[in-house]
Regions:
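Low-complexity, acidic/polar, glycine-enriched regions of mature
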Residues: 19-191
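Gram-negative bacterial Sec-dependent N-terminal signal peptides
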Residues: 1-18
Length: 191
């Protein structure tokens, strides 16, 4: 009888361990938040990225739930052109001295099987918070052949209107205010 009780308790403990959400820490060396923005109303597209990002994802594949919190260092903006980088950080555009970070906080809202397919949340940038939906274009977890630990990777896309956040530089010159976001990230279980 005691063996049956012990076996049942062990089975319950194992089942709850498998069902528990896992917290993943984003790997800054494998996280690439990039964007594409209009220059002079269709003259060209300017592409850039942010070099410094941190965050975490809580993911429960069995419950099909999860959340994410990401912080981007605005001072790490990189167009590949130092003068443009400095202009983007200035009070005329991002005002990085006053608003040094952008943050996204959201929850997974759609799944494709057990993989998240969409996250809805809020983006805070330039002191303004607005709802944003992120489309999760791909999501995969594997055991890394290098570290022998689990790692998950994701490709995310969205489009925002930067004027909604008070970052409307160039509107008087006809700059389209829509910005396409393309984000690649990898993370591993925390701890």
């Amino acid at each position: 009888m005691n063996r049956i009780v012990l076996a049942s308790m062990a089975a319950l403990a194992c089942a709850s361990a498998f069902a528990a959400p896992v917290t993943y820490t984003l790997d800054p060396a494998h996280t690439y938040p990039s964007f594409a923005a209009d220059h002079f109303g269709g003259l060209s597209v300017w592409r850039g990225k942010f070099n410094s990002t941190s965050g975490k994802v809580v993911y429960d594949k069995d419950a099909k739930s999860g959340s994410l919190d990401v912080t981007i260092d605005i001072n790490s903006i990189n167009f590949g052109m130092p003068k443009l980088d400095e202009h983007a950080k200035s009070a005329e555009i991002f005002d990085a001295a006053k608003y040094p970070t952008a943050t996204f906080s959201g929850k997974f809202t759609k799944f494709n099987g057990s993989a998240p397919a969409e996250a809805q949340g809020t983006l805070t940038m330039h002191g303004v918070t607005k709802p944003v939906t992120l489309k999760i274009d791909s999501f995969k977890c594997i055991q890394s052949p290098l570290t022998k630990k689990e790692v998950c990777g994701v490709e995310v896309s969205s489009t925002i209107n930067r004027a909604d956040f008070g970052v409307n530089y160039g509107d008087k010159y006809g700059f389209n205010q829509e910005v396409k976001l393309q984000i690649q990230a990898e993370g591993s279980p925390a701890g």
